[in-house]
Amino acid sequence: MADYPPAALRLVAALRKLPGIGPRSAERLALHLLSAPPGASDDLAHAVKEAKAQIKPCPECGFFSEEGLCEICRDANRDSTLLCVVEHAPDVLNFERSGAFKGKYHVLGGLLSPLDGIGPEELKIPALLKRTKQNKVREVILGFGTDARGETTALFLAKELAPAGAQITRLATGVAAGSGLEFVDSITL
């Protein structure tokens, strides 16, 4: 039975490592790249290399930046006493797209997971505690999901941040607008 050449199989395997890309999607993407006009795959390879070389975590908050502090941390119009803590850098974009948050962010780089060996030192929690005290933050919004790791991290941070005197706020959870109670699980109720 015939199969793709080894280089094509390596390309499919590399694409499968991307989040949300299964075997069929990886194969389709690989075939597209191999069938694309000359230079198209070079453009993609160059863009990936350039992004990896130029984009680094902001030293203040952990969001994406090309030049030292990110755009958000450099913005003097942002409320530096209002801090939203998120798991990963893309979470910042979700808040930004809402247009509702005018404070600053802190990216932890993950959530606490003792079973996986992820404690406060593996995340940017010490930097968060230091930043909260130094910047006299008055409110910290914990922008995590409600799964076990999100809840564990939120409880831990609430306890650790309490001495700083900042108000600790969680994201709203519950019944979605327009849905009836017959569709809501018992935990939400």
Segment roles from a protein language model:
Residues A26, D75-G143, D147:
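Extended interfacial segments that mediate partner engagement and assembly in macromolecular machines
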Residues L9-A13, E27-L31, D42, H46, ...:
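Solvent-exposed alpha-helical segments within well-ordered globular domains of core cellular machineries
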Residues P19, P38, A51, F63, ...:
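Conserved phosphate/pyrophosphate-binding and hydrolysis machinery centered on Walker-type P-loop NTPases
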Residues A2-A8, K17, E27-V92:
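Cys/His-rich Zn2+-binding cysteine-cluster or related metal-binding knuckle/ribbon modules and their
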Residues P57, L69, D91, L108-L111, ...:
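Glycine-rich, flexible loop/turn motifs
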Residues K17-P19, L171:
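Short conserved micro-motifs on helix faces and helix-strand junctions that flank
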Residues K102, L129-L189:
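Long C-terminal interaction/binding lobes of large macromolecular proteins
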